[in-house]
Amino acid sequence: MATAALFETSITSLPLLHRGKVRDIYAVDENHLLIIQTDRVSAFDVILPTPIPEKGKILTKISRFWFDKLAHIIPNHLTDITPESVVSSREQDQVSDRAFIVRKLKPLPVEAIVRGYISGSGWKDYQRSGTICGIALPAGLREADKIPDGAIFTPSTKAEAGSHDENISYSVCEQLLGVSLAAAVSRHSIALYTAAADYALTRSIIIADTKFEFGLDEANQLYLIDEALTPDSSRFWPAESYRPGKTPPSYDKQFIRDWLEQINWNKTPPAPPIPEEVLVQTIEKYQAACRVLTQ
């Protein structure tokens, strides 16, 4: 692939705070962070050795689109500060079109997953127990079926790179967050998902599920943080190929997950390198999702 990929940033003008699975985070000042979307890709909570060129820029564009579109539901951590203004001139190519300056908030210790359709780990849970994260669902549902009575909130723990997220029950979420905050996170998550899913359907995309993250400011005001409804955090299905009973081809990194399942990787580090043909098809899916949703 002709375009060079950014696997890891090397900003020296700011202190590095954290390298996540995909994002590198730097301190700007005591109230702001620089978050850079690299081209790293993770699957099954493991970072793969092969970056996907332009992926970080695509995720940044999609996140900004959703942060703006959904700001009437809940405030988010974005600021008007330009990333180029806080780094040196020689570092600007590392932040251009792939970074945000955000408010420094206290992240909540759960991932807020919303499922509108049964797929992925939710489908596996349902096959095993008839439930997803302790939520009982009617018998006889098929893979990729729309969940009766509307989307459900199914939180999980937040894993560091190399560890695995674990689905948790709502009662455990309440223990971690407190009753009122858990209720607010659940309510806002479902409202965000519903608004996004309704819009996406007008663009012939089904958002099967997604993951949100939230943070609190010093006044305990809740904010949407991290990323929003990207192909990394969501399952996007083309509506025209949707058929209940089988998960359709998607505009997201499920393509990489499927490839990893096919080669029988054991889902522990080190991950195998991604072949060129899988890379090309993955970036085409990300580009298509961005084009269809944001234009």
Curated annotation (Swiss-Prot):
UniProt KW keywords: ATP-binding, Ligase, Nucleotide-binding, Purine biosynthesis
EC number assigned by the record: 6.3.2.6
Tree of life domain: Bacteria
Keyword 4Fe-4S among UniProt keywords: no
Pathway the protein acts in: Purine metabolism; IMP biosynthesis via de novo pathway; 5-amino-1-(5-phospho-D-ribosyl)imidazole-4-carboxamide from 5-amino-1-(5-phospho-D-ribosyl)imidazole-4-carboxylate: step 1/2
GO terms of molecular function: ATP binding; phosphoribosylaminoimidazolesuccinocarboxamide synthase activity
Catalysed transformations (reactions): 5-amino-1-(5-phospho-D-ribosyl)imidazole-4-carboxylate + L-aspartate + ATP = (2S)-2-[5-amino-1-(5-phospho-beta-D-ribosyl)imidazole-4-carboxamido]succinate + ADP + phosphate + 2 H(+)
GO biological process, alphabetically ordered: 'de novo' IMP biosynthetic process
GO cellular component, one term: cytoplasm
InterPro entries found in the cross-reference section: SAICAR_synt/ADE2_N, SAICAR_synth, SAICAR_synthetase_CS
Keyword ATP-binding: yes
PANTHER family recorded: PHOSPHORIBOSYLAMINOIMIDAZOLE-SUCCINOCARBOXAMIDE SYNTHASE
Family: Belongs to the SAICAR synthetase family.
Protein name: Phosphoribosylaminoimidazole-succinocarboxamide synthase
Organism of origin: Nitrosomonas europaea (strain ATCC 19718 / CIP 103999 / KCTC 2705 / NBRC 14298)
The organism's taxonomic lineage, starting at the top: Bacteria, Pseudomonadati, Pseudomonadota, Betaproteobacteria, Nitrosomonadales
Gene this chain is encoded by: purC
